């Protein structure tokens, strides 16, 4: 039988290798390390010594000492265990255990199995280990000893004869694996069974502990034991708990309604597919998306075809489309005539605001910075007992969106053209806006009081745009006026009222109001303020209103002169105070019945716009991705824009976004209506080289101090084109300068001189301009540039000179070049850097 190693014995008994090694040395075994092996007989002695704490006697003296009086108590007790079980238990209980168990969890659990155990024997029981490979752990089934302890004890009680060791004992096997069937080659010898019962525990408790210990042993050895199948069964049982794949649901889907605005993961849920499948399909089609991106209509249709599902695209904006809900509401028709809304448009400085000033008997133009209109204004004028609402729009090119907005809410458009200036770009643009809105156009030829006035020039220019006067057979009224003297103003107003009668403008004043925001701002002490024109219904103080993402209750109404109003009727304009935030210019405002309804509309619109913006920032095609990678060297100027009103802010943003090229662009990191706040300074300081641009606003003392502390530059303007020009200058400074060449002169080589330790010196005659020392030169041979470099030395006779003019001879040394030939030309030039202008 194979020898047993010290560490195997230590593992069985639950002691450390060091402790068992010391015990073995005490017994006189020749062992040095835990890997040292002992014979099965020595192993049995070591078991006895560790369990009982007494050294075994030598075989020669054992029979003699058993009869002596010194060993009388123990010897008598050891001869009786076969006769009475009780005496054996008492003897075992009285056996002292000198070695304390270790505190480690594994050692404690192992030692608890051995406490109070003894090898039942007559004279000497030699314990033989299982004859298996030494790498096999001996403790695999040691717990099984407890399962067979009762039966073995009964067998021992029946056997009256003392146990005599025979030659067979050398091949006896310990019953360690009786509870678990690992293989068929392990058997039990009834005569030579070693049992280690815990006699301090009742048999029932032993049996119960057996079951628990078996379960623990199986759990601990399941990962290392290839024969242990319980863990595998558990894993198989876990695998049964799988998510149910809804293949039947996928087969049942043949058509589905898809919202017009839907994110990718929502679309995947609708068609019972995973988001990864949809993303993979789009990637194959050349579109990189994330699960939160919105899908376009064509993408939805293509995906439906790819998955074999018929998709019906429906519009879900109805959830927050309060305008449609307003229009769908059927009420009794109590329509009455309303005031016409007239928009004045035209080129900058052609007299639009001056015309309105004369009509209103006011001086609005004098209050505008730079003498140009930079806000959309709405004014009420009474003529012949009838009200007319005028909208004054800016003529500067930056206010395209304002002009388009003014044309969309109007009934009649007056195009003002200066008689001394003719048709200009913004004149053409205004006409296009009016035609797009489908509203009548009246041409006012202004500045007729000037000597240089030429109305025919205006008519000819407009004829090229298909705007023909009635006297030329066209359908447009041309009215010569002077906003300065008042010539033709009455005629113009008469034509406006006549045109309004032909249009039969009507509205129902008895229902909830519907209005259009033409301008909005944030005013100190008043909060968000909006200028609106009521199209239908009547807006009253106390009404609950919603305008895009803004909502609230009307706290006050004012006319264009600042007078308080109780209500605004259809076709009239006024200033509304009481909104939760500044609404976008051009937004539609309606009255609703409850605050809850208004809040829900505004919140849904806000959530929709926010998700739309987030999705827009993440969408990118493969081609766009390549372009973005190529933009690694693209420079940008970060700016924060603050303006007094929404319309001006919109115009500034649109103008600055156009200021870009392949090298540089404007990066608007934040914009808003109202004054410059400390949070704006904090944001600007977090971005390198960020500039704050203010329009018609001024920073306060605290803001100025914080900006100075953080070195944030604030620039304020009251004329929009000054702001744009300054930004252009800033961008030009960031752009790479244009490098141009300036030719200085030319010389021809007459003789080449080789100077030792220096190289070649060219004897030249300056034929044009001058040759300068340190200047850049080119060596030209037969019209081809063969070298470019710098002049290293320039001499006239033996003197060093800085410059040699035309007609003089000189000696020229070229840095790093020694291949000059007679007849070559030396061209001198310098590089000049110039700033780029956008």
Curated annotation (Swiss-Prot):
UniProt keyword list? Cytoplasm, GTP-binding, Initiation factor, Nucleotide-binding, Protein biosynthesis
Q: What does this protein do?
A: One of the essential components for the initiation of protein synthesis. Protects formylmethionyl-tRNA from spontaneous hydrolysis and promotes its binding to the 30S ribosomal subunits. Also involved in the hydrolysis of GTP during the formation of the 70S ribosomal complex.
Q: Determine if S-adenosyl-L-methionine is one of this entry's keywords.
A: no
Q: Where is the tr-type G domain?
A: 337-506
- The segment annotated G5 runs over 482-484
What is an example of a Pfam family matching this protein? GTP_EFTU_D2
Q: Name one GO molecular function term.
A: translation initiation factor activity
Q: Could you tell me which residues belong to the region G2?
A: 371-375
Put simply, this protein is called Translation initiation factor IF-2
The UniProt entry, under InterPro entries, shows: EF-G-like_DII, EFTu-like_2, IF2_II, IF2_N, P-loop_NTPase, Small_GTP-bd, T_Tr_GTP-bd_dom, TF_IF2_bacterial-like
Q: Where is this region: G3?
A: 392-395
A GO cellular component entry from the record: cytosol
Enumerate the CDD domains for this protein: IF2_eIF5B (cd01887), IF2_mtIF2_II (cd03702), mtIF2_IVc (cd03692)
Where is this chain's protein located in or outside the cell?
A: Cytoplasm
Cross-referenced SUPFAM superfamilies: Initiation factor IF2/eIF5b, domain 3, P-loop containing nucleoside triphosphate hydrolases, Translation proteins
The record's similarity note reads: Belongs to the TRAFAC class translation factor GTPase superfamily. Classic translation factor GTPase family. IF-2 subfamily.
Question: What Gene3D superfamilies does the record point to?
Answer: 1.10.10.2480, P-loop containing nucleotide triphosphate hydrolases, Translation factors, Translation initiation factor IF- 2, domain 3
Under the heading NCBIfam families, the entry gives:
IF-2, small_GTP
Organism of this sequence: Campylobacter fetus subsp. fetus (strain 82-40)
**Polar residues bias: where?**
66-81
Q: What is the primary gene name for this protein?
A: infB
